[in-house]
Amino acid sequence: MKEAWGPAGTTGCITSLRELLGLVGAHEWHQKGMEISALGSAPHNRIHPSYGVFSPVRGEYIQLVADAPLPSTELAFDIGVGTGVLSAVLAKRGVKRVVGTDLDPRALACAKDNIQRLGLKDKVELIQVDLFPEGQAPLIVCNPPWLPARASAPIERAIYDENSAMLKGFLAGLAGGGGAGDHLT
């Protein structure tokens, strides 16, 4: 439970069975990791999701990033880095510098752990910021929340995007007519 809620306090804790089962499952995934074929061969292809960070259980979007032609290998932005899986795939494909961003400190800690485990810390920089870092990149990836509804728990923020706010912010930041929103070169 320390992974999910931090160090234990002196008082007891009450939680639902659903939440407890989620904690147990998240702990198992974090301990064992998940094989990601786009990261190469075992055992050096595992991502270790943390509680509250979206787990890359569906690999279609990961494989798309692994297989798509790269416009450049100098720099890429990974918006909403989560576990760091897309940053890791890009770095393993030869992108020299990947900047991963997220607002959630738990996601950034998870991504940092995964990037270090994979030996990619010299290629991937992680920044706590809302959407885009400063500057421009020839490649920008993002796996945004896809359901336009309100999240009722922290883990759901990776799935639910109230009023499509993240998606709209991401699209607006790609090319904003020469202003601060021009992040894609």
Segments predicted by a language model, with ranges:
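N-terminal auxiliary segments of SAM/dcSAM-dependent transferases
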Residues: 1-35
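Helix-to-beta-strand junctions that scaffold the AdoMet/dcAdoMet cofactor pocket
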Residues: 120, 178-180
